[in-house]
Amino acid sequence: RNFMRTRKKKTAFESRFLELYPEFMAQAEEVTRRVCASSSYALHRQCIRERRVCHGDYSQHNLFFDREGAVAVNFARCCFDVQISDFYQFFRKIMEKQGWNQKLGMEMIHAYQEVRPLGDAEFENFCIRLAYPEKFWKLANHYFNSRKTWIPEKSLQKLEILDMQEKKRREFVKFLH
């Protein structure tokens, strides 16, 4: 952010990013406080101790379907973690594409719980993950790791789409509490 602020001639992406930054930073700080006050650390340590395996990149790109059901592929990011993290990744991407539709979100959560019921700590962990503005920080990371002399128009478009979806995402997160 300091790099962007000190630039005399800002790109449209940089100007828009700086406008949105305070809101998303406040959200990230609030989620950090929630994590510290929650049982997330203990849950994470327990999952590692119990060697609970997560895919690590669970998305529609790594799922194939045949007559017998779904098959997950590409386990390059496989790790020990809280298993709800795989569902969270899949869920967030679907919800972004579906405009954070509350009905769909609740149907997905209920379907997941029919197969693998969530305890209170896991559900809290899921809600905390959803509350974190991951997409904003992903765009920020992409910007800071790229050549800043030329920023693709697509980056600005993604930032604008994120801003438009943000209210719906926050409403859904609030609805879950």
Q: What are the functions of these language-model segments?
A:
Residues 26-29, 33, 37, 59-64, ...:
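Short helix-capping and hinge/turn segments at secondary-structure transitions, especially at repeat
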Residues 84-117, 130-149:
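Active-site activation/catalytic loop segments of kinase-like enzymes and analogous catalytic loops
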Residues 137-177:
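ATP/Mg2+ or Mg2+-diphosphate-binding catalytic cores
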